[in-house]
From Swiss-Prot:
Subunit structure: F-type ATPases have 2 components, CF(1) - the catalytic core - and CF(0) - the membrane proton channel. CF(1) has five subunits: alpha(3), beta(3), gamma(1), delta(1), epsilon(1). CF(0) has three main subunits: a, b and c.
Job of this protein: Produces ATP from ADP in the presence of a proton gradient across the membrane.
Localization (cell): Cell membrane
Keyword list, A-Z: ATP synthesis, Cell membrane, CF(1), Hydrogen ion transport, Ion transport, Membrane, Transport
Gene3D superfamilies xref list: F0F1 ATP synthase delta/epsilon subunit, N-terminal
GO molecular function: ATP binding; proton-transporting ATP synthase activity, rotational mechanism
Annotated membrane topology: Peripheral membrane protein
InterPro entries hit by this protein: ATP_synth_F1_dsu/esu, ATP_synth_F1_dsu/esu_N, ATPsynth_dsu/esu_N
Name the record gives this protein: ATP synthase epsilon chain
Amino acid sequence: MAEITVELVSVERMLWAGQASIVTAQTTEGEIGVLPDHEPLLGQLVENGVVTIQPIDGEKLIAGVSGGFLSVSKEKVTILADFAVWANEVDTASAEADLNSDDELAKARAEAGLRAVRRSSEGL
């Protein structure tokens, strides 16, 4: 099976690095899927989007991201997000409460996290 090296990094931490069979991300140009040997590209991630990674040896990983960039070369995908959180790390009650916050950063992070949770529950 063909594979591609993937790194998902936020301002706060490295979320994941490893080999994957496909990566999808929501960019300002639309949702894209990246397979091994993809043509090089640079894309801007949408605010409050979702990134999915299918590792070669495990279950699909789903993260909510807010802003940043996606860089693709023949051998590697690098996702540099302003904020990123795994769907399974999101406290949905707290995130839903943050949707009503006056703090725009907290609201954006809540939206990104809840989108990841929804995508995860859809099984896509």
